[in-house]
């Protein structure tokens, strides 16, 4: 399912495609405030750059307006998610490790206590290093993986500390007790880039790889391809959430921000009414159970979540922009919002795979059932239209048609009665097609006419119109009608 959400985010967010499938939700996309030049959200100068980092702020999303839960203002809920990401340094947080009795070396990364019971070396991640001495001077591109590898580790906050199910306990520079921490480890392996990559997460400037382009002549020197600067680059993200009761005063309507596991509990006291509290808990349980924040996208899809792979073929990649990492994170963020939209709607629709029924959590009180029955879902088999707009268009069009037929005779009548601009009126009438024909026939001098100043002139009863004079075939003209057939 997540891959379908990813496709929807690519096709529909920012209204790029206008596809019919983009009408799946009450809102085609959820707008987000994005700061692409944010300061480092972490401490101890651990970010690769002090500025040029990224922050996503959804603002206060409304359960009615943004997620389609049809409810009066006093039953609505607001939800906000803020995500901050930055590439972080590996210098000082990385060590090389060689397996005993082996030539295989690994890079180990130390961003906290990983709770690894089987090792005294509490690293958070390790990845094999590329030994260029065994890679045939860098020309054997098949000797290592020629695709991306991405791995994720998470540290969830709960009640002012890190939850027992967190993957690791972060170092002080990465700790923030009101937001979850997610680390994304990226390796480009033996991917060769056609140009140097200055992006801080995809950074590639090592020119040890040569490639003999089959398009070039046999005597041509090999092309230089650039590979990753280090075995792994690390991207760190904070994600925090917040709920608000829009019916409370502004200074007390929102809960403190917190991680995804605790944000709903922090907001539980905002609703004193038991009915509204049950409605909030159901809504928040959907958000929390889905748990689709931006980090989940690479966590579940792996390297398929990277848009940089679109330009990858047989281990070779074209150039990447300097902000490729920001494009990747923005793509994950949008996919996570689509997933949130879809899961809220799917909760009301129910499951399509009955094999999942044993794990289905059904609404068990009146308020929860009411929320499910109040979900607005678009149906592609039907179309909505405005009756007022349609009626207004028909009425206006009919009025224009009537005026187009009635305006000329009405004005002509007024002009005749008041003797306004008689010459202009008669010239207008005389230039009509039927009046021009009347003038031509009348010049013969044999036909008597009525309505010579009207739109449609007619002959008197029994009058015959002129006929063509064909004595000069190159210059036909009108003549009086013959008295007998022989006179034609």
Predicted segments, located by residue:
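Single-pass alpha-helical transmembrane segments
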Residues: 384-408
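Solvent-exposed, extramembrane regions of membrane proteins
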Residues: 1-18, 36, 245, 255-385, ...
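Extracellular/lumenal ectodomains of secretory-pathway glycoproteins
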Residues: 1-320, 487
């Amino acid at each position: 399912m997540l891959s379908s959400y990813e496709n929807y985010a690519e096709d529909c967010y920012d209204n790029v495609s206008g596809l019919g499938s983009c009408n799946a939700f009450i809102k085609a996309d959820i707008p987000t405030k994005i700061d692409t030049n944010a300061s480092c959200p972490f401490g101890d100068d651990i970010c690769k750059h002090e500025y040029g980092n990224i922050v996503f702020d959804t603002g206060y999303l409304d359960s009615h307006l943004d997620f389609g839960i049809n409810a009066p203002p006093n039953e609505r809920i607001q939800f906000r998610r803020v995500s901050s990401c930055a590439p972080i340094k590996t210098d000082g947080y990385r060590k090389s490790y060689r397996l005993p009795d082996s030539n295989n070396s690994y890079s180990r990364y130390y961003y906290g206590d990983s709770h690894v019971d089987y090792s005294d070396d509490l690293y958070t991640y390790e990845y094999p290093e590329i030994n260029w001495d065994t890679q045939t001077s860098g020309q054997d591109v098949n000797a290592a993986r020629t695709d991306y590898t991405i791995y994720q580790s998470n540290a969830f906050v709960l009640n002012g500390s890190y939850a027992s199910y967190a993957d690791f306990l972060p170092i002080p520079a990465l700790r923030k007790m009101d937001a979850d921490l997610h680390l994304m480890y990226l390796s480009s392996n033996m991917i060769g880039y056609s140009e140097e990559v200055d992006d801080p997460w995809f950074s590639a400037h090592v020119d040890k790889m040569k490639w003999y382009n089959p398009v070039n002549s046999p005597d041509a020197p090999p092309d230089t391809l650039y590979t990753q600067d280090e075995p792994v680059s690390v991207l760190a993200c904070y994600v925090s959430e917040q709920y608000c009761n829009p019916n409370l005063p502004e200074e007390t309507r929102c809960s403190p921000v917190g991680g995804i596991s605790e944000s709903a509990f922090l907001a539980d006291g905002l609703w004193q009414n038991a009915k509204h509290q049950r409605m909030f808990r159901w809504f928040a349980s959907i958000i929390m159970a889905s748990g689709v924040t931006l980090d989940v996208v690479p966590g579940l899809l792996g390297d398929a979540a990277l848009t940089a792979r679109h330009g990858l073929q047989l281990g070779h990649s074209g150039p990447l922009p300097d902000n490729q990492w920001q494009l990747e994170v923005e793509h994950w963020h949008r996919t996570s919002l689509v997933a949130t939209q879809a899961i809220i709607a799917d909760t009301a629709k129910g499951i399509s795979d009955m094999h999942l029924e044993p794990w289905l959590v059904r609404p068990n009180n009146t308020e929860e059932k009411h929320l499910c029955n109040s979900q607005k879902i678009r149906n592609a088999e039907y179309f909505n239209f405005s009756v007022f707009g349609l009626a207004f268009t028909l009425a206006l069009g009919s009025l224009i048609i009537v005026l187009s037929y009635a305006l000329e005779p009405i004005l002509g009548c007024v002009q005749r009665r008041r003797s306004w601009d008689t010459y202009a009126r008669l010239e207008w009438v005389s230039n009509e097609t039927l009046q021009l024909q009347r003038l031509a026939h009348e010049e013969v001098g044999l036909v008597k006419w009525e309505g010579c100043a009207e739109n449609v002139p007619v002959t008197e009863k029994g009058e015959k119109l002129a006929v063509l004079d064909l004595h000069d075939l190159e210059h036909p003209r009108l003549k009086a009608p013959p008295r007998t057939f022989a006179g034609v």
